[in-house]
């Protein structure tokens, strides 16, 4: 009898038993600590939610509930101040989170907060305390790594690293710079109008939900690279890239809920095709090729593009060619982030704005008459943004569209620095992940009458923009805010002025439906419109 083999077998089983028992003790001990003894245990909320990430995984993944709906239910049941909605049951499985604790906090503060426990606030005061220029907090890696895993300005989680990158890129998206982009934007809008007219001549309704997404995609490619991807040319606006973006959003909850699975899939991405990854790779390669060619031949880069901004062209007086502002790898990641999918939120606002206009004949008429005042002839030049932004009703429509589409809907979580912070009058320890979803501000009856209704008139007169947070606020707010406003003005003004639109109410949903997948993932019927080119416009 092989006693040595038996002993080895028993020792292996014993070690496995000890390991499993140790993990169970840690698991149960952590849950009890988080639910009862943790500094955040004083806040109201279900104890299971405070004790374990699995509570949220169960409701979000297995029951299929939207995170914002879950948070609304929690605040309704436990109060409007703050609600714990996730513990740290799987810390031992997620090495990224362990590394984050080690790098970002002292062990003392990590033990105090037990690292990255999530806390959601619903008040405007809390929003202001979290998202302001003085809050130099990192992004929660758990939330952001599930949507983007790059070293782009958006993907960088460390505040100081992100600030350095934003300071470099921000001048390209300044108001003055965006004013020079109007030619490129109008070029793509003109092509959209041609496509809408073509569909009308074929006897078709136009799917404006897809049309706006294709338009926003082509605008971003034109602005960043000097050449669009041609998504507007796809039949019925059925761009594979747009469908890939939806596939990516559909996988967000899975990637967020199971970080270990996410890390494994990323590590074997060469062998396993992730949702939408094939299309992303194709378009990512196109961007990378533009960067390579631009670095090698900078004088061939089209003017007023982001690539041209990052790769300055040489001048006759320069002794040496100017160096790119970023490494080739970082430049490629930055441009890929902006080009692929960065126009999604503004496209959503276009859909909401046009839907709101067309559902109200009086509003349609009034907006049209306002635009005619500055654009008397349809075949005349499109008024510049400096003129359109002075139109009060058009501006009100855009603000209301932004309010009802929210931008990003998931709480943009920030990790409080060591030492803690005061949020809405409450001390929150360092290491806590805190956030407020834009939806809680935009849909609050404390700030808006009938918040679920499209009422542009609420923005006329002395109404304040304080509670409009679609682009977020603070040092990590949306860099493309000026560009987004410019697109919304030019797109809505052009369509209302140069296209006669019919809205078949029986084929459209009164309200746009979505699920929280970081950005809204829209479902239900798309916005269908019959579009006829206005007389005199060609």
Curated annotation (Swiss-Prot):
Q: What is its main location?
A: membrane
List the Gene3D superfamilies hit by this protein, alphabetically: Cytochrome P450 (1.10.630.10)
Species name for this entry?
Aspergillus flavus (strain ATCC 200026 / FGSC A1120 / IAM 13836 / NRRL 3357 / JCM 12722 / SRRC 167)
Which GO cellular component does the record give, naming just one? membrane
Q: Which catalysed reactions does the entry list for this protein?
A: pre-flavunoidine + reduced [NADPH--hemoprotein reductase] + O2 = 10-hydroxy-pre-flavunoidine + oxidized [NADPH--hemoprotein reductase] + H2O + H(+)
Listed binding positions for heme are 478
Q: What is this protein called?
A: Cytochrome P450 monooxygenase flvC
Which gene is transcribed and translated to give this protein?
flvC
Please list every transmembrane segment annotated in the UniProt record, as residue ranges.
17-37
